[in-house]
């Protein structure tokens, strides 16, 4: 029997940069996001933190394509994607994993992957080979015929990550990936996300309130409050920054 063939993998140097240029969003007279700039580079993991009301979620949803910016641009390499809908962004290389469960509950783990792969212009045998390769990569081969509703929170999250890779994205946008996941599964998901960066060269952009679990992964951190980016730097610099402690982390925070 022939081993499943993995999808072609691009090195980080072959992938475009994802950049936000002066993003702004207002609702009536209330400015929620004001002139936000950030960059996610291929092969790095970047976190966006912020207290409630900081504009973090609005910024993240502008990147995903749920909310249209009032000002500014979003580019993927030299391509302006600001006004493109979510499915067009996905086609260009922006993958998205929502906070809410997104696996099809009444499909098996394998069929969850095939349901997405069927939309790609691939022979059926290659679709099945890619599905099996992803199941193996994410430690789900033994659950390939289990229905999604039968999986634990950690298993389901791994399936959703695998499904996000069926489109061979350049970037994955992860919304609260550690919510509802037990500590052991969190460590496994952290390992898998690192492998996406290290082995596939994928850029990962995370927003999550689980600061310690997220910061353990990240290469760089952005912090928002009052609708603006107030900090950008390494996790170590973030943990030591006075403004970050005052507005978000608290004085007793330790890495």
Language-model regions: role of each:
Residues 64:
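Helix-to-loop junction immediately C-terminal to a conserved catalytic motif
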Residues 168:
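Conserved catalytic motifs of ABC-family nucleotide-binding domains
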């Amino acid at each position: 029997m022939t081993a499943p063939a993995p999808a072609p993998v691009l090195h980080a140097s072959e992938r475009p940069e994802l950049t936000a240029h002066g993003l702004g969003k207002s609702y009536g007279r209330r400015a929620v996001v004001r002139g936000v700039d950030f960059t996610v580079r291929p092969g790095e993991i970047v976190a966006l933190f912020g207290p409630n009301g900081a504009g973090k979620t609005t910024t993240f949803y502008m990147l995903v394509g749920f909310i249209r910016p009032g000002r500014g641009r979003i580019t993927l390499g030299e391509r302006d994607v600001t006004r493109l809908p979510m499915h067009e962004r996905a086609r260009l290389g922006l993958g998205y994993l929502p906070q809410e469960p997104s696996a099809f509950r009444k499909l098996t783990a394998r069929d969850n992957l095939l349901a997405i792969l069927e939309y790609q212009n691939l022979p059926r045998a290659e679709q099945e080979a890619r599905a099996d390769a992803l199941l193996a990569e994410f430690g789900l081969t033994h659950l390939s015929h289990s229905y999604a509703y039968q999986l634990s929170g950690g298993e389901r999250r791994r399936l959703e990550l695998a499904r996000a890779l069926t489109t061979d994205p350049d970037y994955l946008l992860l919304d609260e990936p550690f919510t509802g996941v037990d500590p052991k599964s969190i460590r496994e998901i952290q390992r898998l996300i690192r492998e996406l960066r290290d082995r596939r060269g994928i850029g990962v952009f995370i927003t999550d309130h689980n600061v310690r679990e997220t910061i353990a992964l990240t290469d760089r951190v952005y912090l928002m409050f009052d609708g603006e980016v107030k900090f950008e730097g390494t996790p170590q610099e973030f943990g030591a920054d006075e403004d970050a402690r005052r507005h978000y982390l608290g004085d007793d925070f330790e890495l």
